[in-house]
């Protein structure tokens, strides 16, 4: 593995959800060219950690999360994307995709370059990119104009994972990467994760599937009670 891309330093984050889990003095690092897995029964702080890493839950201590050496804990999701972070949340609809928008428009969540300086959106570019994800990840959809909510859970999962991977991330964080997909698609997603690693990307995978984590992880951590 190469240089540290993600560093989590003594992260403490009280949970705003009464049914959630506080994060307490959590330390973690992910280096370029490695896959780090996080195992554990759901409800032990994995979701809260994902919110903290994605920028949905800003942290009080700016240095508690560093991306490529830059303090990132106070940055929002878009600013973190500019540092090379791409993210697949556990919740597909609502967080990973906007249900009522087309797949092409959902590409905008990670393809800000399609918005021109004039403010116009390059729809041809978005449609080409969406079609590329559909083809590469064998997403069953009528085309780039299909709405996100029209896809089955497994096909939407493939689209979201593919959209984030095709952005060529420096840091790729994914929660439950193969939930709801068939055996063939799960094998492809795992293979694509390993290909990202081999290309020098730092990868963090949260999964309840131990066999999956054993297959793809270079290092493995277990979360318990935050």
Which residues does each PLM region occupy?
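Glycine-rich phosphate-binding loops of nucleotide-dependent enzymes
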Residues: 1-226
């Amino acid at each position: 593995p190469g240089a540290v891309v993600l560093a989590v330093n003594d992260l403490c984050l009280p949970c705003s959800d009464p049914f959630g889990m506080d994060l307490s003095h959590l330390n973690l690092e992910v280096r370029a060219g490695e896959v780090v897995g996080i195992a554990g029964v759901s409800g032990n702080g994995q979701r809260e950690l994902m919110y903290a890493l994605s920028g949905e839950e800003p942290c009080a201590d700016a240095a508690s999360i560093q991306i490529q050496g830059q303090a990132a804990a106070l940055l929002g999701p878009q600013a973190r994307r500019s540092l090379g972070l791409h993210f697949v949340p556990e919740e597909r609809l609502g967080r990973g995709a906007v249900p009522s928008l087309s797949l092409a428009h959902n590409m905008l969540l990670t393809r800000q370059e399609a918005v021109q300086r004039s403010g116009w959106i390059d729809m041809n570019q978005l449609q080409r990119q969406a079609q590329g994800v559909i083809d590469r990840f064998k997403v069953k959809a009528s085309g780039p104009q299909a709405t996100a909510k029209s896809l089955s859970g497994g096909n939407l999962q493939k689209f979201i994972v593919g959209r984030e991977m095709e952005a060529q991330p420096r840091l790729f964080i994914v929660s439950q990467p193969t939930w709801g997909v068939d055996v063939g698609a799960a094998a492809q997603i795992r293979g694509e994760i390993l290909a990202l690693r081999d290309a020098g990307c730092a990868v963090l995978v949260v999964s309840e599937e131990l066999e999956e984590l054993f297959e793809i992880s270079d290092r493995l951590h277990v979360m318990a009670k935050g």
